[in-house]
Structure formats: C-alpha cells, structure tokens
UniProtKB/Swiss-Prot annotation:
Region (Disordered): 79-112
Biological process according to GO: mitochondrial magnesium ion transmembrane transport
Motif range (YGMN): 442-445
Quaternary structure (record): Homopentamer. Forms homooligomers. Interacts with MFM1.
GO cellular component, one term: mitochondrial inner membrane
Membrane topology type: Multi-pass membrane protein
Name under which the protein is recorded: Mitochondrial inner membrane magnesium transporter MRS2
Annotated source species: Gibberella zeae (strain ATCC MYA-4620 / CBS 123657 / FGSC 9075 / NRRL 31084 / PH-1) (Wheat head blight fungus)
PANTHER family: MAGNESIUM TRANSPORTER MRS2 HOMOLOG, MITOCHONDRIAL, RNA SPLICING PROTEIN MRS2, MITOCHONDRIAL
Polar residues compositional bias, start-end: 90-112
Transmembrane segments: 425-445, 456-476
Keyword Ion transport among record annotations: yes
GO molecular function: magnesium ion transmembrane transporter activity
Length: 537
C-alpha cells in the first residue's frame, strides 16, 4: 500500500535534461527550438535504459514535453506555438503530444487506443528511430513567417502606444475661479477632456473641425465656438482653446485681459453679483461683438471711399476694387448673421437657459424652465448689438448694390449715346451716298443734252445736294422718334367737349389716375339722376 501511494521521484536523467535545456535555450534563442527538441529525444532515450522505472519514466517524459512546450512560447512568439498545441486543461486521452518524429507520434497514438497500456521493448525501441528514417527538416517545425507582427504582445503594445501618441491634442489656457491663469498653452487629449469635463465626442468635434458659431449647453459646462474664441466654461474654470497651434493673437490676448478683469472684480456688499459662468460668458460676448465692430469698421471705410469716388468718375480699377470689397462685406454679413442666429437659438431654448446656472447646480439648486431672467437679459443685450451690426452690414451691402445698378445704368446710357452717334453718322453717310449717286450717273461716257448747256453742272450739283439733305432730314427725324422712351405705346387721345372719356380697363392709367376715378364717379352719379327723372316721367 505504501508503494502505491508514493509519488514518482525525478531521475538523474531528467534533472540532467532540464539543466541542459535551460542552458542551451537561453544561450541561443534562434536555434532554441531544435535544441529543446533534441534534448527531449535524448531524455527519452536515457529514460528507457532502466526497465524498473518504465512507468515513472513515461510519466516524467510527458512532464518534460509539457515543460518544453511551456518554455518555447517564452522565448519566441506565443501565438503560433499555442495555436498548434492543445489545451493543457483537456484530458490526457485527447491530447496531441508535441513530438519531432513519426514513431513517437505512433507511440502516443497507440497509448490512446488502450487504457491498460503496458509498454514493451518494441515500443521502447521506437524512440531510437529507424536507420532509414529521414532527417528532421525545417518544414516540420513552425515557420518563422507565422510569427507576424500582430501576434506579438510587444508589437501590440507598440501599436497602442503609437495610436496614443498620434491622438490629436488641444492646446488651452486655463483660468481659475479667482481670475488667475494657472495653465498656459497646456496640451490635453480629447479623451482626457471628455472624461474630465463631462463632454461628448461630438462636442469637441464642433470645436476643432467646425467654423460655424455654436453655443452648446451641457449639464456641467458651457461650450462656445464664436469666431476667434473657442471657450469651455465651468462653474469655477474657464478653458480657452487654441487647436491650431498658432501663437496667441491680439483678440485672444484682449479677451484674456478682459476676462481676468471681470473675474477679479469685487462688487459692493449690497449689490448682487453675477455668477462665475455669467461673468465669463459676458467677457466672451463682449470680445465677439468688439471683434465684429472692428471688422465692420475695417470694411466700411474703404467701401464708402470707393462709392464716393465712383460718383465723380467711373473707372475700371475702381469698379474692380468695389467688386472685391463687396465680397468682403457679404462674407462679413454672413458671419455676423451666424453669430446673431446662435444667440437667438439659445434665447428660444428655455431649458438651455435654465441649465446655464452651473454654480447653483453645484449646490443642488435647480431652476425651472421659465426662471432665467438674468441670463436672458444678458443674452438679449448682446443679441441687439449683433443685430445692429447685421443691419448696418445689410445697409452697406444694399448701398453697394444700388451703386452697381446706377453705374450699370450710366454705362448703358453711355453705350446708347455711342450707338446713337454711330447711327447719326450712318444717316449722314446715307445722304451723301444718295447725292453722289446722281453725280455717278453723269460719270458715264454717254451722250446727253445737258453736256451742251451752260447750266448743266449747277443744276446737277444743286439737285444732288437737295436730295442728300432730304435723305438726312428724314433719317434724323426717324432716329429722334426712336430715341424717345415712352411708358405707353399710344398717348392719351383728345376728348371733344361734351364727350365723356372712359378709360380702358386694360391700361394701368385708367385704374391709377385720380382724375379718371373722379370722372367715373361723376358719370355714375349722372346716370343715377337721369334714371330717377325717367321714373318721374
């Protein structure tokens, strides 16, 4: 009973094999697979020399093979080897033992077939291999090409590190609750900003890839994208984004100065002060409206100068400058309209206005949808400013359009004058041609009775001149009639005394002229009186 309960003890050959395997495996990693396999074969051959410990040697050989398969993945890539080996948690009857010879595979397959297996000398001699057995080829082992870059855990880590390094970062300046700058040009990942400030990925997408003005209200933040400012407002923090990596511009510097002044100002004890987020919001809107006014003044002055010059002289260069300035004014008007619409959309959303009280939310105070008087008055004041800027820009655009139409009309009138002059010359040329026609008749070498008279030359010349003048007079008269511009084809006909005039219903004059309406009223009254007289008679 005691012999059956004793655990098997490792033999010297097993210990020698493990020592040899550890030395050779760590000495050369490139040939580690062949070395380990050869050591495994030697271990099996030595373990078969003693018949008394055959069962123990078989169990230990199985353990050696398991240890070999455990060491190999640590030296090489893990996935291709483990892909070819079965799971260690499977029962022994379903395991495919790793071996480099066909005889060994046959030995283990024979062992699977019979549960009461008793090894014989023939099965032990199979480990030595046959004489005609082919040598081990490189194709029998896993190929190095199978160990791709994606199968290595180190390469996966490198890929993740590269993705993390290539993740876009946002530069920002942070201001604390006291108006002090605590971070200048700090870099944050988008994931960090999303996790830290409770935002959504689409919110940051509107910051870094959208140029349209937006005012987004979130449960714990206010996100603004207005012209040159991209700001995140918390109940005690303000972040000014600079995603393009450019240097600090003058409008942003002026905004930071104004923001610090508004956040650091102290109100009197009796006066109620605005919350932190509203003071920051007011600084943003002030900077945006100031920038709009500065841009409008920069555009308005050259436009007015060009318009005044075009009144005196219409030049090609001035018209070209007017075209360029009109495009700039149209772009500015569109930009101002977008800012006004963004503020107007926020004013129409009562729930967003109520959610803008971030400081009260930190104290678990929530307002109703209609209780937002302070922020509504603040936004309405700046909405009026932006609307005035939009109206002024619209007036400037309409002035440019009117000037263009007037210039076009003047150019058309000049073109018509040139065409009229051309027609006059054509009429004069026609008259001279008719006079020379008569002179050409007498240029033929034919005999006539006028040649022998003394008055022939004077008569023919006089007739030619008179005929030319008649043709010119007729042509100029027709041209003068064509030159007149009339609103109607036919003038008002003359009305004889005692004859009533009934305007044509098809003409606009009969409906719009006050005199005609009064005449119609009198005629109707006369008809009514005459009908009454007939009744009395």
């Amino acid at each position: 009973m005691q012999s059956t309960l004793c655990l098997p003890v490792p033999s010297r050959s097993l210990l020698r094999f493990l020592r040899c395997q550890s030395k050779r495996a760590f000495a050369s990693a490139n040939h580690g697979r062949d070395t380990i396999t050869t050591s495994a074969i030697r271990c099996r051959a030595r373990s078969l020399n003693t018949v008394a410990i055959r069962k123990q040697s078989l169990a230990l050989t199985t353990a050696c093979e398991r240890r070999v398969t455990t060491v190999e993945p640590s030296l090489f890539d893990k996935d291709p080897v483990t892909r070819k080996l079965p799971d260690r948690n499977q029962p022994l009857t379903s395991q495919n033992h790793f071996s480099t010879s066909r005889n060994a595979q046959g030995f283990w397959s024979g062992r699977k077939s019979s549960s009461s297996y008793m090894p014989t000398w023939n099965s032990f001699l199979k480990f030595a291999g046959k004489k005609n057995e082919k040598a081990l080829k490189p194709d029998d082992l896993p190929n190095h090409d199978e160990f791709g870059d994606n199968s290595s855990i180190f390469n996966n880590r490198r890929t993740l590190a590269a993705k993390a390094a290539s993740e876009p970062r946002l530069r920002c300046t942070e201001v604390d609750e006291h108006g002090n700058v605590i971070l200048v040009d700090g870099e944050f990942k988008k994931t960090e900003l999303i996790a830290k400030f409770g935002l959504l990925p689409r919110d940051l997408r509107k910051i870094d890839s959208s140029n349209l003005p937006h005012i987004l209200i979130r449960p714990s933040a206010i996100l603004l994208n207005l012209l040159h400012l991209k700001v995140l407002i918390k109940h005690d923090r303000v972040l000014l984004f600079d995603i393009y990596g450019s240097k600090t511009s003058y409008p942003q510097s002026a905004f930071m100065y104004d923001l610090q002044g508004k956040l650091q100002q102290k109100t009197a004890p009796g006066n109620a002060s605005l919350p932190y987020e509203f003071r920051a919001l007011e600084a943003v809107l002030t900077s945006v409206t100031s920038e709009l006014e500065a841009d409008f003044e920069a555009v308005r002055e050259p436009v007015m100068h060009i318009l005044s010059e075009l009144e005196d002289d219409i030049d090609r260069h001035k018209l070209r400058m007017l075209l360029i300035l009109s495009k700039r004014v149209s772009t500015f008007e569109q930009k101002a309209k977008l800012v006004r619409d963004a503020i107007e959309d926020l004013l129409e959303a009562d729930d967003d206005l109520a959610d803008m009280y971030l400081t009260e939310k930190t104290h678990d105070l929530y307002r109703g949808e209609d209780d937002h008087t302070e922020v509504e008055m603040l936004l309405e004041s700046y909405h009026k400013l932006t609307d005035e800027i939009v109206q002024e820009a619209g007036n400037l655009v309409s002035g440019i359009r009117n000037t263009e139409e007037i210039v076009r009309a003047i150019l058309d009138a000049n073109r018509n004058a040139l065409m009229l002059l051309d027609l006059k010359f054509s009429v004069g040329t026609l008259g001279l041609a008719m006079g020379t026609f008569l002179a050409g008749l007498y240029g033929m070498n034919l005999e006539n009775f006028i040649e022998e008279t003394n008055w022939g030359f004077a008569g023919v010349t006089g007739v030619s001149v008179v005929f030319s003048l008649i043709v010119c007079w007729y042509g100029l008269t027709k041209l003068r009639r064509v030159q007149r511009i009339k609103m109607m084809d036919a003038e008002r006909p003359a009305i004889a005394r005692g004859q009533s005039y009934f305007p044509d219903d098809r003409s606009a004059l009969g409906l719009l002229d006050n005199r005609n309406r009064e005449m119609l009223r009198r005629i109707n009254m006369q008809k009514a009186v005459s009908q009454q007289k007939k009744k009395w008679l």
